[in-house]
Amino acid sequence: DRQIDMEEQQLEKLNKQDRXPGLRYAAKQQMXTXRMG
């Protein structure tokens, strides 16, 4: 669980830093789907 939280925090940082969140959002979706199954 802690690892997942850290990954989420890193993605949030990247989202804030990156002006084009499209790629980050897609990566986040992939991670979520990968986690679920």
UniProtKB/Swiss-Prot annotation:
It comes from the Eukaryota. It is found in: Secreted. Keywords: Antibiotic, Antimicrobial, Fungicide, Secreted. The keyword Secreted applies. GO terms for cellular component: extracellular region. Its main location: secreted. One of its GO terms (biological process) is defense response to bacterium. The keyword Secreted applies. Thermostable. Still active after heating at 100 degrees Celsius for 20 minutes. Antimicrobial activity is not affected by salt concentration. Possesses antifungal activity against P.infestans but not F.graminearum. This is Antifungal protein 4.
